[in-house]
Amino acid sequence: MMVLEGASALSPFRRARLETRLQTLVPALRITGAWHVYFIRPEAGQSPDQATLQRILQANAAPAERDADASSRYVVPRLGTLSPWSSKATELVRGAGQPIQRVERGTRIDLAGWPDDASAQAAVAKLLHDPMTQSLLGSAAAAEALFNVPDPGQLRRVPLDGLEQANRDLGLALAQDEIDYLRERFGALGRDPADVELMMFAQANSEHCRHKIFNATWTIDGKPQERSLFRMIKHTHQQTPQHTLSAYSDNAAVVEGVPAARYRPDPATGQYRSEAVLPSAFAIKVETHNHPTAIAPFPGAATGAGGEIRDEGATGRGGKPKAGLTGFSVSHLRIPTLPQPWEAPRALNPRMAPALDIMLDGPLGGAAFNNEFGRPNLLGYFRSFELAEGPGLTRAYDKPIMLAGGLGAIDRNQVEKLRLQPGDAVIVLGGPAMLIGLGGGAASSVAAGDSAEALDFASVQRENPEMERRCQEVIDRCVALGVDNPIRWFHDVGAGGLSNAIPELLHDSGVGGIIDLGRVLTDDPSLSPLELWCNESQERYVLGVPQARLEEFAAICARERCPFAAVGVATAEERLVVGYGVLDAGNRESGVGNRNGTLVAADTASHHSPFPTRDSQLPIDLPMDVLFGKAPKMHRDAAHPGAPQWPVLQTASLDLQQAGLRVLAHPTVASKSFLVTIGDRSVGGLTAREQMIGPWQLPLADCAITLAGFDTFEGEAMSIGERTPLALLNAAASARMAVGEAITNLCAAPVQTLDSIKLSANWMAAAGHSGEDALLYDAVRAIGMELCPALELSVPVGKDSLSMQAQWQVGNRESGIGNGETPQPSASTIPDSPFPIPGETLKSVSPVSLIISAFAPVGDVRTQLTPLLRSGEESELWLIGLGGGKQRLGGSVLAQVYADDTALPAFGGEVPDLDDAQRLRSFFELIRDARDSGLLLAYHDRSDGGAFAALCEMAFASRQGLDITLDAWGDDAFRSLFNEELGAVVQIASEDRAAFADLVERHALTECAQRIARPTGTPRIRVSGQGRVLAEWRWEELFDAWWSVTHAMQKLRDNPDSADEERALARDFKASGLRPKLVFDPSDDVAAPFVATGTRPKVAILREQGVNGQIEMAYNFERAGFRPYDVHMSDLIEGRVDLSAFVGFAACGGFSYGDVLGAGRGWATSILERSALRDAFAAFFARSDTFALGVCNGCQMLSQLKDIIPGAEHWPRFLRNRSEQFEARTALLEVVESPSIFLRGMAGSRIPVAVAHGEGRAEFDSAVDQAAARVALRYIDGDGAVASQYPLNPNGSPDGITGLTSSDGRVTILMPHPERTPRSANLSWYPVDWGDDSPWLRMFRNARVWCG
């Protein structure tokens, strides 16, 4: 093992933060230093060049000196695992020609004052590392264990009379009737099952995978029910099948879209092209990943996002993920620096991450995966909820909801899968198998606390989004072949790993298969058959390809550097045979890292070839119907619970001034900015509405909108609805409200008909907890049989997670008492005390929870509505309430913020409900018609926090004050302001009052719609009623309450100085916001005369593995008159493409090699460490007739090639943002006078631009270099001054520098993303007088002019 030491691993503020936490345990403990350490295992008998390794890793051979009084600890990836960092870095170092098996990274932390006491050492260790993902070592030499390979695991046979014990030991979560079924089937086969067969059966038949409860028969309160839950959901599609192309039969549903043209490279020539305008389709899917997120929030949420992305990609014969959504429901946050009166102390489950950790780390994991894969996340929700119900029982989201969903494009001719034929190759596409995520399907199907802690760890997965990007590129290349797509049928690999995915692939086509485990790619030779077959290593797909197309498929994979293995063959006999060497060796050569197998014909395979286990039998040899045929069907016998006991909130004693502040500060209502700015929202170039709105960029959009293509203004919209706390009082109402809220949110988009809206329903419940099963049935029936059919809404896709409970004994980390009905609470519980007694059994149970995601095609996206109030004309705000005159407060946020920890909270009473479905239809049609008539200036739905929250948010977004008048809304100001009935607030011009009132009357909603407020220019919000002022707040006072959660979370998670700077700017009523200024006319196409000549210069759209911004880059160049070509670095390395054939190239944005060695460094290394490639680039830059553009990752890469770029010697390097966070913002740029060929005639302009990067802070070698560098773009504030304040300057670059050019202007690099906004509609906000062409299109047209 070689050990090299790198740069400092902790920034000053992170070091100080960690030291402060350590000193709460050991006051004398000090951190004296922290460094990255690289552990390298060379190939056997090989000696890597140490100087090259040091250059690539930016490391030193000698470690930093340790203080005399300090000792070192090493934080490394958990022993026995392979980190995502290692996967990508090892590939990069090998690609540079270095003979290594693996490189791994850890952190050396030097500490002075290390305690002698063992218990203190253990406590400190817990702060230094996360035992779910890391190990803590006492020396660098101990890291040798990272590379230890245990002896290969062996196959085990389980006696039929030992199935119950195996069920417990392996965490199979099998019911007794399933165990009896297995005993019967294997008894008939005359043999004992193998452990791998049992695990495969458990995964394939887990609640997570087979939805046994949703397919069960039911008896409720002694009465048999006619329909299963799933049958009631399917009823919605039966009643409204129109506009749905695929339902319940694939990884995602597919619905009709608008006419559009796909833009992608020609598979034969590589030239980008717009295809014919055809009716489009889009896939919709929403998943949850609750159990893994509860155990390890970052990887749990990351792989949740990754799994849903794969679902969209594996729809039909290949989809393309386009835009994502996310959501979290957790218990009280209990932020140490922001204590809240409604957050009572409570003992928490020691086996699960607390809510605060989940919300600090989980969203980062989900965002990081989306960012690196290259999918914008445009929508989300966040709920914090916790409520005492009785002794030892809390209704809460200790087991969180982690929602991951989205929509993807799919060609109409790719929607239907083709059945596999006998002889077809079974392929695993993607990364290698590792011992991670073992048993996740079964683990997520049981209550937390019912499985051993070691099984909790085993069920957590690890993420590698850059690998998933490569897989998607392969899928895209196959789909581009149209009817010649070699993929017949495929699935993503998720719960259960290959043991679920491959049998599903075969079963769905009515075939069997022979699978050779020896051909499965793995980075761990110690895996037993069970571990190899059942692990849930991520970023994998299984697919069927005809044998005759294997060579073609292999060439596509080789170009994308995407590993794959042909592991088996389909057979006519419906039998599954899995073993080692069950297929002839054939040709085992490969084109990607010696990992691709080519199969021989099926009839040469032997069922009983030798393989290396201690057992002479095959690991798996079963008829397919053992897995899919006649397993026992579940029956549920349920009874309704008694009436809820929570008292009703009495508003007479409340203070309105205080109530307003508390409601806005509740995390469910408060600003979600800290959850939004970490996620890229512009990648792909097709975003038309993200969360941020207006010149002041607040996250208040009601829905997300994407464009169907680059040449249309039509597209798709999606929204979320959820009102889960209401289910504790009325489960059916909660379900109706979720559907209603999804619709009121979606009304902000130009949706034309209700029947075009398709819903995804995600159901969560604590199955088996007293009364919950009956409430779940009520909720499903309420929307499946009643509401959705009445409104012509269908639910063609969904998911359930029915183990939403956690139980534990105080002081016993290993406790768990089964997945049955709720145990009787311990008699030792003291009802009035928040402090439990050791040994006491506690339980946390979530409400029945329905999350609705709504999707629909939309018309002209330029007619969308947002909560941004229009200023400059007399206007008024109207509230349209759908409660039928009722103002029900049961379950409201107002009730939650007045929880009393000495008694049951006053949460009860009648809840909001959708009493009349047709009233919602009338509302939808009113908003549609008013928008089409141009009557609506702004729109915001009413939800958590009531009309008061909606009005305040509109005021915040617009830097407006409000005069709110309640005279038309009753005598109780609390009910008027804080009821959460369905509805919306709209802004209309005062002169349009009569026209709007007439339209309201025509839709029979006159009694539902009244004026409620008037915008003012003063920084105050006033509420009046009954002829007097009831309350008045300063604008900043309310804003501070609303921003408090974001500020506190940012200070804990990010650079606290950055958090303070953003708060100061955000709360400034007089802040300028985005103030664009143009010195040119974007509609003037300066390239038109050159394009008219018919000459289109060739430009290479350059990408490396992990790059994801090539499509939008190509489109901009094509719009400007170029011929763009898709060029992968592998094309240049292998000589398929010659760089000299192009007049220019663009290095695109993304995460090349996952940015493992620093952003862009891996890409640059792949050029600089290959002499031929380095020479080719140097020759290209030396020519006077060429140009180059580097954006984001391409900018970072080109900055490291400055030694071979003439006139670039003063360029900086780009390092971690000052906030130490990925920053996705819309920032204001000034175009600086420079020689850049891209920016001619634009100097002096101030233009909003999309920013999305984690390492954009420019650092120059010296002040001389900074002064001499040719700056082309810089961040400014709304008044035109150079921006130094965060987030106006999102990365902390000196003087706001974010774009530079070479001395002759031919090579320009910039960190922001002008290529993502070729049209004004792509911008988060733009002035109303701008035309359709974005100012940034001028950059590309300037390049065309330069070419002549």
From Swiss-Prot:
Gene Ontology CC: cytoplasm
InterPro entries: Class_I_gatase-like, FGAR-AT_N, FGAR-AT_PurM_N-like, PurL_large, PurL_linker, PurM-like_C_dom, PurM-like_C_sf, PurM-like_N_sf
EC number: 6.3.5.3
Glutamine amidotransferase type-1 domain sequence ranges: 1099-1348
A Pfam family this chain is assigned to: FGAR-AT_N
Main localisation: cytoplasm
Active site: 1192, 1313, 1315
Enzyme class per UniProt: ligase
Keywords for the protein's UniProt record, in alphabetical order: ATP-binding, Cytoplasm, Glutamine amidotransferase, Ligase, Magnesium, Metal-binding, Nucleotide-binding, Purine biosynthesis
Subcellular location field: Cytoplasm
UniProt-annotated binding residues for Mg(2+): 702, 741, 745, 941
Domain of life: Bacteria
Family statement: In the N-terminal section; belongs to the FGAMS family.
HAMAP family: PurL_1
Protein name (Swiss-Prot/TrEMBL): Phosphoribosylformylglycinamidine synthase
Organism: Xanthomonas axonopodis pv. citri (strain 306)
